[in-house]
């Protein structure tokens, strides 16, 4: 099973190779089989990407916004036309079940391109009347923007970052995770097919040193990262030394609160989506599930029953509901957290082991895991695990659960399940998190902003807000009379 691209990098509208770079192997997580071999970007590759971006950006920014938007919308159409092919590529690259990638990856990328391509012509500055004279503002491109992606949603992240950047008239250089380098190249081909001028979307592969080179490059105007909090701190410090714009979409340990009047099946479904989708490798997951004491036993009993029915196996079988984790290292990390949870006194309600799957004995699979009797101070309730491990905590009243939910360095997301919408709005209003749901979880339409509070990030992806993060404001004062000067 191979998925070797034409070359490692895409620069100036063409595939480019330089075999002097360190070769990161591309592994299919379900079998531990190498499916492609790419080369990390050398300094020459990086400089070529900036030269191509610099050459193209000025003319692109000068185009009418509606013309830029037309190309983005055409790219969205191409992604939808090729959705099954792209979804299979994403499944190979990530190990995620095809059942998921068909609806959540290239499809979401297309949604972002269509959205930003449609609204950019209406994203304008302000006019201010000043008693005869007036002022106006212009939204202008930043220049060359850099995106650094994560391995859980490769093509989605590449589009979520590049679509608003390109819509605003910027050029874009994207570095995928070294674990999942393939689909960003497919997105580059789609942009090319749609008519995007050469040099505006470039892909360079590599490890953290390549990302650091992009962040520190003198021509980089903005950096957008999806990654861990430690990586975000490091990149933000580097960018801050040169006062570069940043968007940081980082980790979380989000609370999901279930009151005793909630629809039990919906709440359980939301908790499962918020812990087991993409094998738990979602930054916004609601991994601290607070359940009211009156329904705790019923909730856990039904949760365990439904969790044990999750189908784990061949990611290309569309009946499969959960694939493997991204790597052996990630599987071992998750297993270490499960071990720690048991050692600290949490009750293992189900899962916790490595399933035996015929034909996939070398894959990085793990059982969906539920812990009960979890307390706020346990490691599994404090640290981001990034795997299918749910912690169920009991609470008694509203004020208590709000305080406990907020007792975290993270603030990416939160959810509330209740039949009382007034209470739902009140609780969400008190939660310190940037992306919240009432009677739902982990739904992320591109029309609304996505991002976090506290250590979970700065700036926003998606929604009209994203355009503001890829632009700068110019204020112009126009005097309609003579200059009144005391000199």
UniProtKB/Swiss-Prot annotation:
Presence of the UniProt keyword Ribosomal protein in the record: no
Annotated residues for binding of K(+) 2: 243, 454, 457
Annotated active site: 161, 249, 283, 461
Swiss-Prot/TrEMBL GO biological process terms: glycine betaine biosynthetic process from choline
Residues with the Cysteine sulfenic acid (-SOH) modification: 283
Reaction catalyzed: betaine aldehyde + NAD(+) + H2O = glycine betaine + NADH + 2 H(+)
Keyword Cytoplasm carried by entry: no
Catalytic activity, EC: 1.2.1.8
MF GO annotations: betaine-aldehyde dehydrogenase (NAD+) activity; metal ion binding
Pathway(s) served: Amine and polyamine biosynthesis; betaine biosynthesis via choline pathway; betaine from betaine aldehyde: step 1/1
Protein name in the entry: Betaine aldehyde dehydrogenase
Species this protein is from: Brucella suis (strain ATCC 23445 / NCTC 10510)
Record gene name: betB
């Amino acid at each position: 099973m191979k998925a070797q691209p034409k070359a490692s990098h895409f620069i100036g509208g063409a595939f480019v190779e330089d075999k002097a770079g360190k070769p990161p192997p591309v592994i299919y997580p379900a079998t531990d089989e190498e499916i492609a071999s790419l080369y990390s970007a050398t300094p020459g590759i990086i400089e070529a990407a900036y030269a191509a971006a610099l050459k193209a950006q000025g003319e692109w920014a000068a185009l009418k916004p509606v013309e830029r938007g037309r190309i983005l919308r055409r790219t969205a159409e191409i992604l939808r036309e090729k959705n099954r092919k792209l979804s299979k590529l994403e499944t190979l690259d990530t190990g995620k079940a095809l059942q998921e990638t068909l609806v959540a990856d290239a499809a979401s990328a297309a949604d972002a391109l269509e959205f930003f391509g449609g609204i950019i012509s209406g994203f304008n500055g302000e006019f201010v009347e000043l008693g005869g004279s007036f002022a106006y503002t212009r939204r202008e491109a930043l220049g060359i923007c850099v995106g650094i992606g994560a391995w859980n949603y490769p093509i989605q992240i590449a589009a979520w970052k590049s679509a608003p950047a390109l819509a605003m008239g910027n050029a874009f250089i994207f570095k995928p995770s070294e674990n999942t380098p393939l689909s960003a190249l497919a997105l580059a081909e789609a942009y090319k097919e749609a008519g995007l001028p050469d040099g505006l979307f470039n892909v360079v592969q590599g490890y953290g040193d390549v990302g650091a080179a992009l962040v520190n490059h003198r021509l980089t105007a903005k950096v957008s990262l999806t990654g861990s909090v430690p990586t975000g701190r490091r990149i933000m410090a580097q960018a801050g030394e040169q006062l570069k714009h940043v968007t940081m979409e980082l980790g979380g340990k989000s609370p999901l609160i279930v009151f005793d009047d909630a629809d039990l099946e919906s709440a359980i479904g939301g908790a499962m989506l918020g812990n087991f989708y993409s094998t738990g490798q979602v930054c916004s997951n609601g991994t601290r599930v607070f359940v009211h004491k009156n329904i705790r036993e019923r909730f856990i009993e039904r949760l365990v029953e439904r969790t044990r029915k999750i189908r784990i196996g061949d990611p290309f079988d569309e009946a499969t509901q959960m694939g493997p984790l991204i790597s052996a290292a990630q599987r071992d990390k998750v297993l270490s957290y499960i071990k720690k949870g048991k050692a600290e006194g949490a009750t293992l309600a189900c899962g916790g082991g490595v399933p035996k799957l015929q034909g996939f004995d070398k894959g990085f699979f793990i059982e969906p895991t539920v812990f009960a009797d979890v307390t706020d101070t346990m490691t599994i309730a404090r640290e981001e695990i990034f795997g299918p491990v749910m912690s169920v905590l009991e609470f008694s009243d509203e004020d208590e659960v709000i305080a406990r939910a907020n007792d975290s360095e993270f603030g990416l997301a939160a959810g509330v399940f209740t039949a009382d919408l007034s209470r739902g709005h009140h609780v969400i209003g008190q939660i310190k998190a940037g992306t919240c749901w009432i009677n739902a979880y982990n739904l992320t339409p591109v029309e609304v902003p996505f991002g976090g509070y506290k250590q979970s990030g700065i700036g926003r992806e998606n929604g009209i807000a994203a355009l503001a993060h890829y632009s700068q404001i110019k204020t112009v004062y126009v005097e309609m009379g003579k200059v009144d000067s005391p000199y």
